Amino acid sequence: MNSIEISTEIAKIKYWHHHFDFGDGIETKQGKEGKFCRKFQQWILSGIPEDLTDKTVLDIGAWDGFYSFSAEKRGAKRVLATDSFIWQQQELYGLDHNFWRDFGAGKQGFELARKIYNSQVEDYNIDVLELDKDKIGTFDIVLFLGVLYHMKYPLFALEKVRSVTKELLVLETHISLFFSLFPQPLMQFYPSNELSKDVTNWTGANIALVKSWLLTAGFRKAELVKWRKDRAIFHAWC
Ligand SMILES: C[S@@+](CC[C@H](N)C(=O)[O-])C[C@H]1O[C@@H](n2cnc3c(N)ncnc32)[C@H](O)[C@@H]1O
């Protein structure tokens, strides 16, 4: 694809979750929001190991796939991007009251970015709670970024994540700032749209609870590696 074709295809996609800079001045977003996404993505990226040479990487809840493509660029020999909720939204566009339809959210961004990068990243539509090593195998490094607080059953979800992790889990999540003042494992529950007006957000764990969940789910060691406002990055080792 030449630059004009790339720009045309990018413009056809109504909503990009990730900011991509494809070079030659071609970006997926402009202005303030683009700048925020870029900064946030760089912050998350800085919590992922720089060298992924010869590693297998699973990106759970990949959406547009920015972190999957980044893992490939960092030398990973195999990258599998999985998602379900947002990748299925296009199929649900016909339904009434589909909040995401108006956004235009779906899998289009992932597919176009993969084409532009000529990437070998694989994709698989699977719910977190269906993750199973017999279906997808196990991976040296697993990325679970921005997904945990969308889980109604967070500990069960982490057990599923643990079952497909061989070496290291990189977890990024929303945390409750208030409850993180306490050393005990505590959680805020969002029964409706209290967090960011999004009804798919359920939990705001504190730092201690995320670590406890990781150990309970079967990881040998769990550490907080970065913390900014109400977002935190943890590493957990098998
Ligand atoms: C806030 S986005 C995070 C996207 C990306 N990982 C990032 O950090 O930018 C949450 C993602 O989790 C996915 N997701 C939510 N619930 C899921 C589920 N039950 N199974 C699989 N993916 C899910 C959504 O479709 C969406 O892509």
PLM feature spans:
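N-terminal, positively charged/glycine-rich alpha-helical extensions of SAM-dependent methyltransferases
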Residues: M1-E27
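S-adenosyl-L-methionine-dependent methyltransferase catalytic module, highlighting the catalytic core
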Residues: L129-K135, F139, L143-F144, K152-C238
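Conserved SAM-binding loop of SAM-dependent methyltransferases across substrates and taxa
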Residues: D64-A76
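Conserved SAM-binding strand-loop segment of SAM-dependent methyltransferases
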Residues: N118-L129
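Glycine-rich phosphate-binding loop and adjoining beta1-alpha1-beta2 segment
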Residues: Q88-R114
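Conserved alpha-helix/loop element of class I SAM-dependent methyltransferases that forms part
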Residues: K32-T53, S70
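Conserved class I S-adenosyl-L-methionine
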Residues: K55-W63
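Conserved SAM-binding motif I beta-strand of class I
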Residues: R78-S84
